[in-house]
Amino acid sequence: MLLLLLAVTAAAAVGAGPGKAVQFLAVGDWGGVPEPPFVTPREAATAAAMGRAAAERGADFVLALGDNFYYDGVRDEWDPRFQETFERAFAAPELRALPWFVLAGNHDHHGNVSAQLAYSRHSERWRFPHYYYSLRLHVPGTNATARLLVLDTVLLCGATDDFGVGATPRGPPDAAAAEAQLSWLQRRLAAARHDRYVLVAGHYPVWSVAEHGPTQCLLRLLRPLLRRHRVTAYLCGHDHNLQFLHEDGVGYVVSGAGNFMEASQTHRAAVPPGAARFFYGAPESPGGFAHLRLDADHPTVRCRERY
């Protein structure tokens, strides 16, 4: 299937939260279940905790890191899953007031990702302009800016089964489209050299100690670019836990605990020595997400669960 992928650039209004900072919540793998009630207890608990964090800590937007609808995405833009798994599940007033910037995961690609793009016309808070896109953020009260580059790592690397130990992507469905996305990313990273912070987001991890481990395709294609352009952090989901890793000046945030929680650290030996700084995947956990804050002079990431 030939996919026509367009670069999209948008501006995000920030500064709603307390303090002179860009703040946002990052949650991945949050997509409920395909039968009633279409949400899991962990998704409900995570949604409630995100609402409290937005109210108490502040947030300007939510970054949804893929696997938005388990297990096979959505059929069309009128699919009731948009209401059952998203609109009604994340219904706290503090969340309803925030835009959600969305990317696709492998389970979304089992269904109709174009329908998720089209749903942006039906919901004021669902912002999914294209498969990959760029956001420029302004730190309020300062001259500092941040660039967020949102990717489709499934189109870069291929599909995979989310529930298989070490399952690896099978290669891009369209090599030319994958190359176009990579070229777009290279240009955007080069253009972001004057931004205080540069964040890149995708579904598959670059580094992970957990069940799926490092994504070899991204180690080959993405890691050199992140290091060369001194990217602040790469954010992802796919592994169902919370992690922070740091390698060669780049932070790696894994936030895939919105719907499931897994304790596996099968691939701890596969990451560079000393890179893994934080891991949380307690089976009894109610789920979790990350809260990121970009001040004028430093970034902060906090991993959170129900509190």
Task: Annotate the PLM regions.
Residues 1-12:
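Cleavable N-terminal signal peptides of Sec/SRP-targeted secreted and luminal proteins
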Residues 10-80, 179, 187, 209:
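N-terminal active-site segment of His-dependent metallophosphoesterases
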Residues 24-26, 62-64, 102, 200, ...:
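Residue-level marker for buried hydrophobic side chains located in beta-strands
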Residues 35-37, 70-197, 212-233, 239-295:
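Extended active-site neighborhood of metal-dependent phosphoesterases/phosphodiesterases
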Residues 297-301:
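Hydrophobic residues embedded in beta-strands of well-ordered beta-sheets
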Residues 303-307:
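Short, solvent-exposed aromatic-acidic interface loops
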